[in-house]
A protein has these predicted regions:
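Conserved alpha/beta-domain cores
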Residues: 1-29, 36, 52, 57-78, ...
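Subunit-assembly interface segments of extracellular/virion macromolecular structures
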Residues: 32, 36, 40-50
Length: 624
């Protein structure tokens, strides 16, 4: 096992002897992880070749890697977990990373202090879509969490300062203080960690010359470094598992968790896991995923952006499948409505022990920063969205900023129940009609305004990613300076879905549903390559001209041109690539546009030739 540069020494507090021993043990799963990802790409390629939609599993089949029959999983004939006390009430879970790009430890610890003093019932500290990956940010993230969970004196000093700052804001915005006894309040919020998905490689570690799975690294570093402190505090070890596409992949995660528990001498099922349902294929296998994770599984989360992206990508072969403006694809829209309904039915199907699971609702991306009118309008919409999810059966939801906790949490507080476990819903169906509902399109606008929004935010997000800001407050450039239009806190998913929809519109001959005075285009005009090129030039020019508060001045000659090159290549190529993040990852810490273009071409050529995604860190790859 090789750790690049001097990181083993610089992060000796993270790469401890115990961690290194566990990594060496867990690295035994690396080949299986790579095989699973090869199978994932082949399933996708076969569907595209055969123009075949995703379907339900054969009820008589076995879930790969397990001895569980599909029909038994659907019938609840498996042993699941009881929900531990500190997850029984999770009305609001905040989300965000525990590190900032190129920041001192004290600065990053402020992120953790804001989170743990926010009053959220849980906080998902992100190692995935919201965590920048420049330099050694994944290790900075782990360091912050270890210091905070262990209640290091430096963290406690920072937390005391942050408590006062939070009260200053809350007195002005809420008319009251939200932190009374800050030391006691640190123990209120359940600490949760999201690992990177199986589709990503770690940027720092190689085993026998091959990159080690980022999922294996994140899982091992977090659990080994923190399980003793969490257990001593009476807290659960809780993870979010992202981007799972199949029950077979869930079974692999289950084996990872069980193996690490065994290595550490922990009882089977000590580690608890939520699964983010952000992939269309997973929605066809919800009960199977529950069963495959067994004693580790506690609940599902319904995202929005990543899920829309997965539906778009899974139907890239179908010329009739064209999404409307992204703003129209709400949780009540066509396929999203049916997706949410299947999740709530799945968690409320009892297992063999009579246990139900949790449904954690989707993300609220609004931030209460802007004009008085803009904030009031956005907060009304945010509360209405939370009220809808609570009515539909969610036991809680996510917020993207600590300030939103006290705006959204009262929705569940007023409802009163700790959770909605066991709320009765009709049983899941597995008919052709049920399958069709999961890709149901409904009429919606498809406009130049919508295209500009897609492009502007996709470019800005790619730029932010290159700067190490995978969680970024964004809005389309046309609304810069308009405080009535609020910024939304976005992560990698926002870039993925925007490029997928632009690719759909361009390569499937999407037509506009409204006249556009600025371009002179009429209803029925086709979204052509020439139109895309024009909009790309115009939206890029707006970002170059933007104030440094919206687009960092230094990025305009470094990471922004690379973001443009990636967006242009991804959207215009007739081949639909599975991940925007792949092309961004290949260019982390790179500001050379020519090198970026060469890497983009190399990735695309490799994918077209062999179906292989280049996911390793090219800066440290053998032979480069």
């Amino acid at each position: 096992m090789q750790i690049r540069d001097n990181l083993a020494k610089d992060y000796a507090d993270i790469y401890t002897p115990e961690v290194l021993a566990a990594l060496a043990f867990m690295a035994g799963f690396n080949d299986e992880q790579q095989q699973l990802m090869a199978e994932r790409i082949e399933r996708r390629a076969a569907r595209i070749r055969e123009r075949r939609p995703i379907g339900f599993l054969d009820p008589n089949a076995r879930i790969p890697g397990t001895d569980i029959r599909v029909q038994d999983a659907r019938d609840g004939k498996f042993i699941g977990a009881e929900i531990p006390p500190d997850l029984q009430r999770q009305w609001i879970q905040g989300t965000g990373p525990a590190a900032k790009p190129d920041a001192p430890v004290r600065s990053s610890l402020r992120n953790v202090a804001y989170a743990l003093l926010s009053g959220a019932d849980g906080w998902m500290f992100d190692g995935e879509d919201a965590l920048g990956q420049i330099s050694a940010m994944s290790l900075d993230n782990q360091r912050s969490l270890k210091l905070a969970i262990g209640r290091d004196p430096l963290f406690l000093e920072v937390a005391g300062q942050v408590a006062g700052e939070m009260n200053t804001w809350s007195r002005g915005f809420l008319g009251r203080e939200i932190v009374t006894d800050w030391r006691a309040q640190l123990g209120f919020t359940t600490t949760i960690f999201r690992c990177r998905g199986l589709h990503l490689d770690d940027r720092h570690i190689r085993v026998r010359g091959r990159s080690l799975s980022a999922a294996i690294v994140d899982l091992t570093l977090y659990v080994v470094n923190n399980h003793l402190a969490l257990t001593a505090a009476g807290a659960s070890i809780v993870l979010y598992l992202p981007k799972i596409q199949t029950a077979g992949e869930a079974g692999f995660w289950n084996r990872l968790l069980s193996a690490l528990e065994g290595h550490l001498g922990l009882a089977e099922g000590t580690i608890k896991a939520y699964v983010l349902i952000e992939q269309l294929e997973a929605t066809f296998q919800l009960m199977e995923i529950r069963a495959a994770l067994g004693l580790h599984f506690v609940g599902f989360n319904t995202g929005r952006w990543d899920y829309i992206n997965s539906v778009s990508d899974a139907n890239c072969w179908d010329p009739a499948f064209i999404n409307p403006n992204i703003e129209s694809v709400l949780m009540t829209y066509g396929y999203m409505r049916h997706y949410e309904d299947r999740v709530r039915r799945a968690v409320n199907t009892p297992d063999a022990g009579g246990n139900f699971a949790l449904w954690q609702g989707g993300m609220e991306p609004n931030i209460p920063v802007g004009s008085e009118a803009g904030v009031a309008s956005s907060m009304d919409k945010a509360r209405a969205g939370a009220e809808r999810e609570q009515r539909e059966g969610a036991s809680g939801k996510w917020v993207a900023h600590w300030k939103m906790v006290h705006i959204i949490r009262p929705v569940w507080e007023q409802a009163g129940a700790a959770n909605q476990l066991g709320r009765p819903f009709p049983p899941l169906g597995y008919t052709a009609a049920d399958a069709a509902d999961l890709t149901l399109l409904e009429p919606g606008p498809r406009t130049i305004r919508g295209a500009r929004n897609l492009l502007s935010v996709a470019l800005q997000y790619g730029n932010a990613f290159g700067q190490g800001l995978q969680a970024a407050a964004l809005k389309a450039a046309d609304f810069f300076g308009n405080d009535d239009i609020l910024y939304l806190m976005e992560d990698m998913a926002t870039g993925e879905i925007r490029l997928s929809i632009l690719w759909e519109w361009l390569h499937k001959g999407a037509t506009l549903t409204e006249d556009d005075p600025e371009t002179g285009l009429k209803t029925g005009a086709v979204f052509t390559a020439a139109l895309f090129a024009r909009l790309l030039d115009e939206e890029y020019a707006k970002l170059l001209a933007a104030d440094h508060r919206d687009v960092h001045e230094g990025s305009k000659t470094t990471t922004l041109p690379i973001a443009r090159a990636i967006v242009e290549a991804y959207v215009t190529d007739p081949v639909k690539y599975p991940w925007y993040i792949d092309l961004l990852n290949l260019n982390l810490n790179n500001h050379d546009l020519d090198l970026a273009r060469a890497r983009i071409t190399r990735y695309m050529d490799e994918f077209k030739t062999s179906g292989t995604r280049i996911t390793e860190n090219l800066d440290t790859a053998p032979g480069r």
